[in-house]
Amino acid sequence: MLIKQHKQVWWQEQERLKGIRCKLESEIRSCLNEESIGSECFCELMNFEKELSEEWCAYLTAVIDPIQQLRTGLKRWYPTSQSAPCHEGSDATEVLEEVDFVKKQSKAAFERLHQEQWHLEEDLLDLSVKLLDHSSEEKPNLLSEQPMELVTLDCPYPDLKSSILNEFCNFTERYQEKLEDFDLQLEDIRSNFQLSAEEHWTYQAVLDQYPGNLLGRRALYLDMLQRYFPHKSRHHLVEHEKYCDQYHFAREQRRILIDNWSRSRKDFIQKAMLTLLEACAAHEMGSLLAKDRRRQQELCADLKAKVSQWRAQQEELSRLEMEISARRREREEEKEKLWKKKELLRREETEIKIRKYWAMKQQKWQEMEKRDLRRLEELKKLMAEQSVKDRERVKYRQELLEKRLMERKKLALQEVQEEEERERRLEALRKQVAVAVQSDPVRMMSETLAWKARTGSESEEEFILQKPLFTLTTYNEQQIISDPRLRFELALREAGLHKTQYAKEMLPKIGPQKPPRKDTESTVFKV
């Protein structure tokens, strides 16, 4: 899971660095392609770029191309050497010597390139250190310098100007002391670092890869730092992280102090210039109005009072800032002491709990072992008793089974007797509903009274037309009623048994009085 998160972070960092690189390269190209290319600096850059491209082409021709040619030659030579193993070994030795020679050349070239890379990195590091030292030296010099705006400004009152400059010196000395305290604090923290300068650079690069809003950022970069520094324990890395946080906090406080000094210096210069301009204006008014000396003195006193008031305000402000910073430092120290005490107490409580836990576990294991042994003995006794009971139950079940078989035989015999009795009753019922009426086809084919009444008033011709074309041989009412199937169904309906299972079984079994002719049987449902 951590490897997947590392891969995602590496991919994002690679995309970000690639974008920054493309942006810088485009800016450099656009800068080089401007009209100011004729200047000496840009000409040197163009010449340096040309030299780099020529060196790269020479490196490809001298190192990379021979290796590629040797590789392709080995790929072609290997199958032929495998297919013809009976040849002399001189070719193989020559090939191995050539490969060793190319390896030595490439190794020497790579060592030379690594040496040049190391020298370039050292030069860049020295240059960056010089630039940082120069910038860090400039800021204290700026603190010690007097503002040229106040020095060059003419003031008719030297005492006022000297007091303002002295106040500025006192003001800058307080900030200088605070800045020196922060520098000493930074040096003290830097001396406690657990990693070397190169390892610290790697540490900072790893931390910069993981953005601050990433979930689980600390676990990820600690895991990656342990991979980069396997010789360092997690405790050393955590300690270095703590000192780095303190170092960054102190640097941020130092930056805030310098920003406050710049802002206060600007405000002081503005107020001092306003005061001096007011003094100049007052002096001009006094020179024009010589009689109004008293007013000038009052104005000077007022201005001095303002300066002293502003000085008191600045002293109060610096005192409050020092108290706030001291309280913050004390609060941080108290928090760290409290955290250490809590950690020690927590560890002691954890050890006590672990001992109690193992003692309870040992006691529980012994009790469980005793209980299991007792339970094993009880189970053995119960199994012996149960085996005796099981044998008795098997014997009892066998007797019950024999008894049930005898009962089933009796029930089967009784059912057979009941079935015979039912057949006898049904046979008696069949005899009761048997056909007893003789067939009368003449009556069946004769005219009815209704037909006679209908055809009595008509002519003979109409009567002839209404006669059937042929005689229909069918059944009369007596024959239909005499059918045993109909009579059996009517009897069942009267008894309310026409929907029972008995009626469904018996109706298909009853046949007509005369069997049907074979030529009248339908073969539709037999196909």
Swiss-Prot record:
Keyword field contains Coiled coil: yes
InterPro entries tied to this protein: CCDC148/CCDC112 (IPR039902)
Coiled coil: 289-353, 401-438
Domain of life: Eukaryota
UniProtKB keywords: Coiled coil
Keyword Coiled coil: yes
Descriptive protein name: Coiled-coil domain-containing protein 148
Species of provenance: Mus musculus (Mouse)
Record lineage: Eukaryota, Metazoa, Chordata, Craniata, Vertebrata
